[in-house]
């Protein structure tokens, strides 16, 4: 049987959740001979190689693995997988996401029903449990993104990706590469179709000093690629996406209680909100601190660039 579908999953230092991600992908209702999973390890330093070896031996479907010895970045990892793919339909799944058994079938059906080039997208739902991810009592729709293309849960034909030019590897190590590719896909006239039955579950571990520190570091890295993204697309749409307007800065200040909430006490405030029966307020406060870290990173890069230009003069 010919492989129809290639699942593209880049990963870095997510060994525990990666094992569950691959277990879920190997348990799809789609015939195991009809799809493959390609995992590209972006220079992990944890137990990822051992997890990949065990998953490859245990899975019903074919799992192919590649390793980037140095941290080449997520755009480069996805591009490597796309070039190596044998399936014409590419489905993007992140390594901290878990797919219900009907997930791939829903994506395949979406494309079979359309004769045109399309992007199929589905909901991304938060789950707090790795043991019973699809029944987690804290689950709720997380991704309300209206971006044209997002790699959290999307599928399209490999030939279309090649025509659009793949992901921009200069957006290293990650950040904005999906939006950037989305602009090119939109220019090609590609339609989007939203399938509610193609949901995927995104694992969010409980907030802790370790996970919060990792989230802050992620925002700092995202900020590093923002100037390059804006340089490529200096539009008002991108200005809004990057939260670079005075209104966004004011809104963030309000969200952080005019500086009362900061990285040093955000977790304590989130715990208070949980005790008061308002966990949503806690998440809102934490999100404000994370956004402030991103905005500070972008502002620092911009100031550094202005200083360099003055020195050059």
List the predicted regions and their residue ranges.
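N-proximal low-complexity "stem/linker" segments adjacent to membrane-targeting elements
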Residues: 1-27
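Cell-envelope/extracellular polymer assembly enzymes that use nucleotide-activated donors
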Residues: 3-6, 36, 180
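A conserved acidic beta->alpha catalytic loop
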Residues: 24, 41-50, 70, 94-97
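Glycine-rich, basic loop-to-helix element that forms the pyrophosphate-binding segment
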Residues: 68-85
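Short aromatic/hydrophobic "clamp" motif used to bind/position activated sugar donors
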Residues: 90
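Conserved donor NDP-sugar-binding/catalytic core segment of glycosyltransferases
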Residues: 98-133
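Catalytic core of nucleotide-sugar-dependent glycosyltransferases
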Residues: 200, 210-238, 288-303
